[in-house]
Amino acid sequence: MTPPEITAETRLKTYLESYQEAGEPLDGWAIVEGHSAAEKPVSFIAITGTNAGGALASAGIYEAEVKILVVSQGDDIPLAAHTAAVEAVRGILAGARIASILAAINDAAWACSGLAYEGAIEARDETTNKHGTELSYRGWFANL
């Protein structure tokens, strides 16, 4: 049995949305599940979880790659606001808040024992004036 990535996506989405409601810098951004979500606005934050298996899979512990893609349209959201959103996501998912993150991801069948930041990739498309930043995280899920 592999971990339910869609559950992790949904729970992380809800977790990030809770910070929007609290007035964090993510206010005004659409948060969606999956990079290929059908109804994406021009500027959005997409969360995708992919089971990567890993060396501990035989013991019921799975590694999962979590990608958070922040995309903004230059005319819609200025670059400074884009950068602020990226930093807000990184801050929300920082180690100091790990207990809240794990509580948001865990469910009756699976427990996430950690979420580690692995880096970011940035890209800009001058023809469409879009800016994107993909944040990479690795999580470990155990079957309860």
Language-model regions, residue ranges each:
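Short, solvent-exposed polar/charged micro-motifs at secondary-structure junctions
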Residues: 39-44, 125
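Charged, amphipathic alpha-helical segments and their flanking helix caps
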Residues: 1-29, 48-144
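Short acidic low-complexity segments
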Residues: 30-40
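N-terminal, polar/charged subdomain of small-to-medium soluble alpha/beta proteins
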Residues: 35, 43-45, 62
